[in-house]
Regions:
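N-terminal nucleophile
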Residues: 1-126, 137, 158
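Alpha-helical junction/boundary sensor with strong preference for TPR arrays
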Residues: 154, 190-191
Length: 223
């Protein structure tokens, strides 16, 4: 069984006669759903319906299709793994920008559920990266908006405060210390070791080599 969709949305699919049943595929506009060794022969049609009726970006629609497959019984061998790869429609030559999602769940009792959680976390980190780029370009307000989006997707406990910590560091580096302090404090509330780590950043060039500044940041984290 093989399926291909090119960048223009053209599809080519083949399900061979020796694929283990239930096996089959369905092709739609710009997509293909295929499966083999399924418990029921309703899986690929259910995937297609879910994909077409769902909203959101490509990752969200693919997850909807996977969930629909599981609802029809999924793989007759049971559940174990799931994966998703999504790349930008137009490449920049910079892999870290073009590969939007590249996630795998190798062994889990609920692989699609776990993959869905990881996609949500990746969305948060994608928003963090966008915020960093805005701040680096001097568009701090746009950066703050992206950071808020990121932290709404990833609660502090989901990252042990790391997302909030690096937001704070980026704002300190941009000279926005008062705005950085609440984020750093959020990180500290999750794990007090963030106060130790911030003191190590000047040696790596990530913050100014200013002991008074570091002392102030640590003090504000601990308030």
């Amino acid at each position: 069984q093989v399926a291909m969709v090119d960048v223009q949305g053209r599809t080519a699919v083949h399900t061979g006669s020796r694929c283990i049943a239930a096996a089959g595929h369905v092709v739609g506009e710009g997509y293909s759903c295929q499966a083999n060794m399924m418990e029921q022969g309703t899986v690929w049609e259910a995937m297609a319906r879910a994909y077409e009726l769902s909203e959101g970006d490509l990752a969200a629609r693919m997850l909807a299709a996977l969930a629909a497959a599981e609802a029809e019984g999924g793989d007759i061998r049971g559940r174990q793994s799931a994966a998703i790869v999504v790349v930008a429609g137009e490449g920049t030559g910079q892999v870290w920008r073009d590969r939007l999602f590249d996630l795998r769940v190798e062994d889990h009792p609920d692989p699609v559920g776990e993959l869905t959680r990881l996609v949500g976390l990746q969305r948060a980190y994608n928003a963090l990266n966008a915020g960093d780029e805005f701040v680096a370009a001097g568009a701090v307000e746009d950066g703050l908006a992206a950071y808020r989006d990121a932290l709404a997707l990833a609660p502090d406990e989901a990252t042990n405060g790391e997302a909030a910590f690096w937001v704070g560091v980026s704002l300190v580096d941009a000279g926005r210390i008062d705005e950085a302090a609440p984020f750093l404090r959020r990180a500290y509330r999750q794990d007090e070791r963030w106060a130790e780590l911030i003191g190590r950043l000047p040696a790596s060039g990530l913050l100014p080599d200013d002991p008074a500044l570091i002392d102030e940041l640590v003090e504000r984290m601990r308030r």
